[in-house]
């Protein structure tokens, strides 16, 4: 256990140092934007393990007035042939990076663990597209599913949809669960970014430079929030007062993560208003560890735990 903990800290320190150095250089020239995405994908390939094989995978676009939104539909071997439960996933990456590809392992594990269809969303990213482009894309895909447009061709049961995401994706999932509380069956929030007003935890420590640090959060404020009111609940779902009748929530936080306190606070707020919550805190894990399942075995286990949660709160498949 001691060796594993040391390895975790060394790895997080290394990632943080590289991130800090790179953030100081980025001015968002087109070539640098491409480098951001390629570097993340390279890290994921190096430190993640391939997810389970699927029966079918379909890449297509969800039509929208502003932007045809790329999505990937995972259909696991144990999925029903009939329209069935579907989990919509919004990837993390600080609103400026991340993709369907970078989170392929996570979504495959959830699909296999549930036996449900999983729809992963490639929403627009800052700085090319600052707020509210990303949330608008995620909402458009959710509306498309809830209105039944994915049922006949893709087997998405409009009456049985859940949503979730990690980090930035968790931020958008939390807001959409609030807005569509009567329609969404469950929500999965992996180390979510819940507010944009104060990026420092109440008791900051050296662990808060690990993987996701204050500089990276400041970077999000400058290039994603970009002058918008950070008190809006679409940016800061933590500030929503009315949480009654929200769908059941699975909330994960990490000890080596400056977002840990706001994630825990949101879980407590949900519980206080009668929302069923399953809360997990991984004390020795850094932000983003689900993308590094080769390094952290819990990166393989947590998506399966979340899959168990989804099965508890979504309708069983037919047949």
Feature names for model-found ranges:
Residues 165, 169, 173:
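Gly/Ala-rich beta-loop-alpha elbow adjacent to hydrolase catalytic centers
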Residues 101-120:
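Short amphipathic alpha-helix adjacent to the substrate-entry channel of hydrolases
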Residues 1-76, 315-319:
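A glycine/proline-hinged amphipathic helix-loop "lid/cap" segment
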Residues 146-162:
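Gly/Ser-rich "nucleophile elbow"/oxyanion-hole loop immediately N-terminal to the catalytic nucleophile
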Residues 251-253:
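Short beta-strand/loop motif that positions the catalytic acidic residue
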Residues 178-228:
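Hydrolase active-site cap/lid region
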Residues 83-92:
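Short beta-strand element of the alpha/beta-hydrolase
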Residues 296-319:
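Catalytic active-site module of serine/aspartate enzymes centered on a nucleophile-bearing elbow/loop
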């Amino acid at each position: 256990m001691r060796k594993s903990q040391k390895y975790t800290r060394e790895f997080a320190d290394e990632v943080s140092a590289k991130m800090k150095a790179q953030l100081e250089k980025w001015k968002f020239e087109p070539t640098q934007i491409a480098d951001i995405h390629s570097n993340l994908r390279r890290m994921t390939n190096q430190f993640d393990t391939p997810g389970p094989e699927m029966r079918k995978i379909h890449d297509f676009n969800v039509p929208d007035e502003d932007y045809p939104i790329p999505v990937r539909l995972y259909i696991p071997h144990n999925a029903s042939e009939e329209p069935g439960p579907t989990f919509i996933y919004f990837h993390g990456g600080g609103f400026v990076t991340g993709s369907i590809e970078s989170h392929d392992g996570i979504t495959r594990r959830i699909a296999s663990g549930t036996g449900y269809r999983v729809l992963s969303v490639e929403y627009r990213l800052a700085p090319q597209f600052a707020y509210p482009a990303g949330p608008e894309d995620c909402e458009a895909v959710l509306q498309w599913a809830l209105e039944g447009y994915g049922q006949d061709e893709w087997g998405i049961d409009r009456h049985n949809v859940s949503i979730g995401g990690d980090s930035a994706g968790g931020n958008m999932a939390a807001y959409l669960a609030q807005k569509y509380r009567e329609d969404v069956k469950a929500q999965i929030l992996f180390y979510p970014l819940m507010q944009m007003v104060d990026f420092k935890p109440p008791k900051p420590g050296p662990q808060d430079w690990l993987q996701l640090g204050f500089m990276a959060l400041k970077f999000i404020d400058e290039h994603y929030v970009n002058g918008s009111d950070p008190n809006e609940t679409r940016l800061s779902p933590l500030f929503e007062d009315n949480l009654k009748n929200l769908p059941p929530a699975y909330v994960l936080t990490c000890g080596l993560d400056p977002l840990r306190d706001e994630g825990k606070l949101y879980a407590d707020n949900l519980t206080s208003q009668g929302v069923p919550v399953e809360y997990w805190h991984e004390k020795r894990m850094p932000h983003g560890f689900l993308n590094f399942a080769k390094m952290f075995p819990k990166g393989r286990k947590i998506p399966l735990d979340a899959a168990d949660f989804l099965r508890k709160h979504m309708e069983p498949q037919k047949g």
